[in-house]
Amino acid sequence: MNLERIIEEFHQGHSLNAYEVFGAHFVDGGVRFTVYAPHAENVWVVGSFTNWDENQILMERMNFQGVWTITVPYLNEWEVYKYKIQTRTGNILYKADPFAFYSETRPNTASKLVDLNKLTWTDDKWLQDRSLNFDKPMNIYELYVGGWKRNGEHPYSYDMLADELIPYIKENGYTHIELMPLSEYPFDGSWGYQVSGYYSLTSRYGNPQEFNRFVDRCHAAGIGIIIDMVPVHFVKDDFGLRYFDGEALYEYPNEYDANSEWGTMNFNLWNEEVRSFLMSSAAFWVN
């Protein structure tokens, strides 16, 4: 991995793999945290491993464009964390990681450490044959995972979904499953269309390893997966992207353009880093 090149492409607006640098990554010696906060005076990592504010960890400014980073030793998977950001006006914000790969279940809002290096795939045959299917008919079954079937008061997990959905798809002649957004979101009623975590698999139905298993089983059955994405707007919740470092960053700087008709914030697509953030998110889910 060429860290410097990825960061350069991130700032230029055409990165497809910014997630390889940003976020929380298990590396030799601990977990490397990297976040983009150009307007911040200081950034700390806080979480279950620091007893939150008691032992906060100050991050280092990596470049003049506002990338902050720190490697923290001796951390465990599934620990929770946030970024504590001091703005230019001296205010303190607590923000979830924009590049988090997993998050707490609502109403909690912290990011969670997860080691994606542990994901294993057995779908080589599917990937090899995929290019042979471009000129074949498609029959797509779209579903909202939270509403397809219920297990009492709870939605199906990814494992339960695979057990019942795959036979149903095969029996009815569908070739692909289109899943409504699976990126983390705080409001159940949005069905995932008001996103807070663009790299974070929603924790409602299971963890990344369990989703990995679901996709593997679908591919083994010859079923393709399509994931819906929402690269237009994001939630206004205080823990999220809105005024991430105390000033407009992911959203437009003026209120008229920033506010959408859905009560959310519009992404500022003129911003190079925002474009890289969204394009890398799409590539992350595919990869």
Predicted features and spans:
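The feature marks proteins involved in alpha-glucan
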Residues: 1-32, 62-142, 147-155, 160
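Glycine-rich, histidine-containing beta strand-loop boundary motifs that form or position
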Residues: 35, 47, 72, 85, ...
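Short, surface-exposed loop motifs enriched in S/T, G, D/E and P with embedded aromatic residues
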Residues: 54-63
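Substrate-binding/active-site clefts of carbohydrate-active enzymes
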Residues: 125-137, 144-287
